[in-house]
From Swiss-Prot:
Organism encoding this protein: Sinorhizobium medicae (strain WSM419)
Entry keywords, A to Z: Bacterial flagellum, Periplasm, Signal
Role summary: Assembles around the rod to form the L-ring and probably protects the motor/basal body from shearing forces during rotation.
Name of the protein in its database record: Flagellar P-ring protein
GO MF term set: structural molecule activity
Family designation: Belongs to the FlgI family.
GO cellular component, as recorded: bacterial-type flagellum basal body, distal rod, P ring; outer membrane-bounded periplasmic space
Subunit structure: The basal body constitutes a major portion of the flagellar organelle and consists of four rings (L,P,S, and M) mounted on a central rod.
Pfam family membership, one: FlgI
Family matches, as PANTHER family: FLAGELLAR P-RING PERIPLASMIC PROTEIN FLGI, FLAGELLAR P-RING PROTEIN
Gene (UniProt): flgI
GO biological process terms, semicolon-separated: bacterial-type flagellum-dependent cell motility
InterPro entries reported in the protein's UniProt record: Flag_FlgI
Localization, UniProt: Periplasm; Bacterial flagellum basal body
Classification via HAMAP family: FlgI
Length: 371
């Protein structure tokens, strides 16, 4: 039953990859490329989450939390000299956010918070005012709001139950943008589109599609493929730049990608692209299981013999070898590759090893990506 499930899952993964490859061969430019001048920027900040129900940082184990509490209270005009704080309702957190391109002051962002100390849960807490800075050290946003946590943590004196991660959460729309990123989009005459998956065929096809549009609208060529990732677009003199990009990003192009096999060794997931080919190769698959069991015996001395208790080791070694199976794989198509692997009853972990060996033998005509 398990072997049938493994075969079904592998076949489903390959069929799904083949469906994606054929269904998404034609895509809009906005779905496969982005404007170089319109990239995202990362923001980061340090703050405090308050209002926790005894699940915050222990101030003895997290001295930076104690320092932050005192600094915050002093900024609010409250003196903290001569007193020791023993609260467990506050947690020090790292706050991160992504600033999208062309974001204007007053817009809101989602932020993510993560505990820095030994807090056990951020559920029910509130992030107090935290400034978010970019890589240049400038403050671009300020975050504050209630923290939403997906997991839960319950514990008693002798048992504890955890589900999900309770030491990290999100503050939806918790940050307000205070500073606009400098942008030369409106003043630019040359724009660069960057492919998310670099490929020369796709880049050349994108430039050709843009030039066909430009020939009909402006009577000339405006695009040129610079390399496998970048396509240069020159703004016509009488064109409105925003209108031009709106038309360009909705053009439909034929996308291409190299043959690729993606393997995640931790989860056993294997995704095989439709264009993967395997030269004729023989594969032998078999397993050897060795089990070592230790069953020591305690030998007690006779009464009044002045002997000592002895430890007598007892080791049992068993070896079991499953008969190896030989199959001829000729991957003229993706279906034949899957059928060949399934015919010898290979489990997902065995398929990973076989694919790596086929690649080492030079018979796998595809890029092997290990995650």
């Amino acid at each position: 039953m398990k072997m049938r499930a493994c075969k079904w899952l592998l076949t489903l993964a390959v069929a799904f990859a083949a469906t994606l490859s054929s269904a998404y061969a034609a895509s809009r430019i906005k779905d496969v490329a982005s404007l170089q001048a319109g990239r995202d920027n990362q923001l980061i900040g340090y703050g405090l989450v308050v209002g926790l129900q005894g699940t915050g940082d222990s101030l003895r184990s997290s001295p930076f939390t104690d320092q932050s509490i005192r600094a915050m209270l002093q900024n609010l005009g409250i003196s903290t000299q001569g007193g020791d704080s023993r609260t467990r309702n506050v947690a020090a957190v790292l706050v991160t956010a992504t600033l999208p391109p062309f974001a204007s002051p007053g817009s809101r962002l989602d932020v993510t918070v993560g505990s820095l100390g030994d807090a056990t849960s951020l559920r029910g807490g509130t992030l107090v005012m935290t400034s978010l800075s970019g890589a240049d050290g400038q403050i671009y946003a300020v975050a504050q709001g209630s923290v939403v946590v997906s997991g839960f943590n319950a514990q008693g004196e002798a048992a504890q139950l955890n589900q999900g991660v309770t030491t990290a959460g999100r503050v939806p729309n918790g940050a307000i943008i205070e500073r606009e990123l400098p942008s030369k989009f409106k003043d630019g005459f040359n724009l660069v589109l960057q492919l998310r998956n670099p490929d020369f065929s796709t880049a050349v096809g994108m430039a050709a599609a843009i030039n066909r549009y430009a020939a009909a609208q402006f009577g000339g060529r405006i695009a040129e493929a610079l390399d496998s990732q970048s396509v240069l677009v020159q703004k016509p003199k009488m064109a409105d730049l925003a209108r031009l990009m709106a038309d360009v990003e909705n053009l439909v192009i034929e996308t291409d990608a190299p043959a690729r096999v993606v393997i995640n060794e931790r989860t056993g997931t294997i995704v095989i692209g439709q264009d993967v080919r395997v030269a004729q190769v023989a594969v032998s698959y078999g397993t050897l299981t060795v089990q070592v069991s230790e069953t020591p015996t305690i030998v007690q001395p006779e009464p009044f013999s002045r002997g000592q208790t002895a430890y007598e080791p007892n080791t049992t070694i068993e070896a079991q070898s499953d008969g190896g199976t030989v199959a001829i794989l000729n991957g003229s198509s993706l279906r034949s590759l899957v059928a060949g692997l399934n015919s010898i009853g290979v489990k997902p972990d065995g398929i990973i090893a076989i694919l790596q060996s086929i690649k080492s033998a030079g018979a796998l005509q595809a890029e092997l990506v290990l995650q």
